[in-house]
C-alpha cells in the first residue's frame, strides 16, 4: 500500500515538473516578464533616423518628436549607441522576440522624456514617405554585425521573421 502511494506521488511530481518545465520554456520571452513592455525608445529614434532621415522642426512629424534628442544637430551617433545599449540589456535568447514586440506595438501617444528615455509606448511610427514596413527591414538589422553586433537565439546575429510575433 505504501509503495502504491509513493509511486503515485512520484508520478504526480514528475508530471507537474514536466508541465512546469514546458510552461517556462515556452513563456521565457513573454513581454512584461522577460523584457519591459515600453521597451526600446532609443531604437525607435535610431530606426526613424536611419530610415526616414533627420527631421527638423516644422516637418510633418508629431510635435513632440521634433524636440527629441536624436534630432538635435551634432550628436546623431548617440541614437545608435543608446539603441545598442537597450538591446544589450535584453537577454540573448529574447532579443528577437523583443524586436518582434517592438514592431507590433501601437504608435506612441506621448513624448519621450529625454532625461529618462521613458515613453508610454514604444514602436514604429507610420510617417508620410516612411511607412512602418520600410522601418521593419531596418529593425531586422539592429542585431547584425554592421549595427549593434549582438548575438540572438542560437548564437546568430540576425532575427528571422521579425514581423511574426511568437507571443500571440
From Swiss-Prot:
PTM comment text: Five disulfide bonds, which are essential for the inhibitor activity, are probably present.
GO cellular component entries: extracellular region
PROSITE patterns: CEREAL_TRYP_AMYL_INH (PS00426)
GO molecular function per UniProt: alpha-amylase inhibitor activity; serine-type endopeptidase inhibitor activity
Subcellular location: Secreted
Presence of the UniProt keyword Disulfide bond in the record: yes
Tissue-level expression: Developing endosperm.
Keyword terms: Alpha-amylase inhibitor, Disulfide bond, Protease inhibitor, Secreted, Serine protease inhibitor, Signal
Pfam families reported for this sequence: Tryp_alpha_amyl
Gene3D superfamilies: Plant lipid-transfer and hydrophobic proteins
CDD domains the UniProt entry points to: AAI_SS
Record's signal peptide: 1-25
Note: CM proteins would be involved in the cooking quality of pasta.
Protein's job: Alpha-amylase/trypsin inhibitor. It could be involved in insect defense mechanisms.
Family of the protein in this entry: Belongs to the protease inhibitor I6 (cereal trypsin/alpha-amylase inhibitor) family.
Assembly information from the UniProt record: Subunit of the tetrameric inhibitor.
The protein, known as: Alpha-amylase/trypsin inhibitor CM3
The organism of origin for this protein: Triticum aestivum (Wheat)
